[in-house]
Amino acid sequence: MLYPIFIFILAGLCEIGGGYLIWLWLREGQCSLVGLIGGAILMLYGVIATFQSFPSFGRVYAAYGGVFIIMSLIFAMVVDKQMPDKYDVIGAIICIVGVLVMLLPSRA
């Protein structure tokens, strides 16, 4: 179970990091090179997600969505210095429970 978690985290870092660089370029006036690097990192995210050991594309991306939410809240705390409120935390917990329901049961 460690390998899928590692892939989810690596994919999340690429998606959030790449998206943030594009945000900086288009919304904060950073140079276009920042945006190009962000785009390249986002492309890498798409490749990394294919390394998951789960056979179903839809299930992998649905489960990853829950992980992405948690990582986005952590990113907001660390980078943007914006603390999640109780509704953010409750929603994130619900998402992680959903991820576990999707991924943990063995299927025939």
From Swiss-Prot:
What does the UniProt keyword field contain?
Cell membrane, Membrane, Transmembrane, Transmembrane helix
Q: Does the UniProt entry include the keyword Transferase?
A: no
Annotated Gene Ontology cellular component terms: plasma membrane
Transmembrane intervals? 5-25, 31-51, 60-80, 86-106
The source's superkingdom equals Bacteria
- UniProt cross-references to InterPro entries, sorted A to Z: UPF0060 (IPR003844)
Q: Identify its membrane topology class.
A: Multi-pass membrane protein
Q: Give the subcellular location.
A: Cell membrane
Major localization class: membrane
Q: Which NCBIfam families match?
A: PRK02237.1 (NF002586)
Among HAMAP family, the record links this protein to:
UPF0060
Membership in a protein family: Belongs to the UPF0060 family.
Record PANTHER family: UPF0060 MEMBRANE PROTEIN YNFA (PTHR36116:SF1)
Give the protein name, as stated in the record: UPF0060 membrane protein SAB2216c
